[in-house]
Amino acid sequence: MATTRRADMFTADGKPSDDDPRENGPTLGDERTTLVEALRCQRLTLEIKCAGLDAEAMARRSVEPSTMSLLGLVRHLAEQERATFRVLMAGQDMPQLFRSETHPDGDFDGAVPDPGVVVEAWDAWRAEVDFATRFVAEAPNLDITGNDPLNKHGSGGGALSLREVLVGMIEEYARHMGHVDLLRERIDGRIGQ
């Protein structure tokens, strides 16, 4: 397993490039612009790190005993996007995509090396990201709130502002992008920033 130059990870098609697409966004802006751009870069990192992999590689659990795989992370992040923006913020009554009460780890356990499962995961993730992007763009400000019955901290009870939700999603992605780095390197030696 040969190590590939870091610059090779900066393209969605897996071809070498000195152009990191995450550097195309605004570098100056207000709070909303800054948060939205940080989240966009994290989402793009997920796509970049998974580019060029077949279903077998996407589903590979290469850090045993963990059931984590790149495909499982795509499914997990689709679930997080849905729960955060559709359910918590928009108040939609939506079923979970891959998990259930009887199968709480369905996002990872159901990440099998089937091309159809990979397509389904990416389609779900992109649909949830598209919804979230529209929701944030149309929100009048970052102070709008959603209700999270599990959030009992602070003076707002279960209320969370869009600002806090964006910070939380950036944290969620950032945590998992470290996992993605290691999983991808174990698959084919590719590394990147």
PLM ranges: what are they?
Residues 29-35, 116-119:
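Active-site rim elements
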Residues 2-18, 22, 32, 36-106, ...:
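Short, contiguous alpha-helical
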Residues 105-146, 163-169:
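Acidic/histidine-rich alpha-helical segments that form the ligand environment
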